[in-house]
Amino acid sequence: VPVMSFLVAHPRGRLLFDTGVHCQARVDPIGRMGPERAKRLIVKSREGDDVVPQLGLLGLKAGEVRYVANSHLHFDHCGGNEFFPRATFLVQRAEMEAARRPGFAPGYNPSPLDFDHPLDYQLVDGEHDVFGDGSVILFPTFGHTPGHQSLRVRAGKGADLVCAADACYTRENMDRDVLPRILWDA
């Protein structure tokens, strides 16, 4: 499954939805993910595929991102968090509480190496209107993890774009009610 990040440009600032896998996981998977996870998961990205170089292709620096919203705190969605020290991070309170309490949610074991940095985390409860104008909304889609959230962006002309992250991998999965392979509760 590809790991994607989404950049939203708004008049009041930029929001990045998910930061992907840490670049170290590509060159030292055991050191970054541990032997068990490195054996199960193969990182296929190439140098330059990480979120910061991709922003560079758009002429942007990490410091120009005002908000980072993590869909959840698995390594493939928050691995690049540390590269955005000036951003405000928007994470569901239930997600952060579960992540910081090992064993609290059976089967849920995010790595503190990916999310536990001295960053400006703003914990949200439920739906959150990022810019206060209804154009960029975070909303809970619990199931994959205790506090998974998705992103809805008003795209204009009555159309919305939804970034579901690991709540639903494809449109076909949604149409057929196929659940994600990894579930905390469903």
Residue ranges and their predicted role:
Residues F17, S71, V91-Q92, G143, ...:
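Active-site flanking residues adjacent to catalytic metal/cofactor-binding acidic residues
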Residues V1-P53, S150-A167:
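Conserved beta-strand hairpin/beta-sheet module of binuclear metal-dependent hydrolase folds
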Residues Q24-P29, A98-R100, R171-D175:
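Short acidic/His/Gly/Ser-rich catalytic and metal-binding motifs that mark active-site loops
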Residues G34-V43, P110, D175-V178, I182:
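Short glycine/proline- and acidic residue-enriched helix-loop micro-motifs
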Residues F75, E82-F83:
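Active-site loop-helix segments enriched in His/Asp/Glu that coordinate
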Residues H22, L41-D76, F83, T88, Q92-F142, ...:
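Metallo-beta-lactamase
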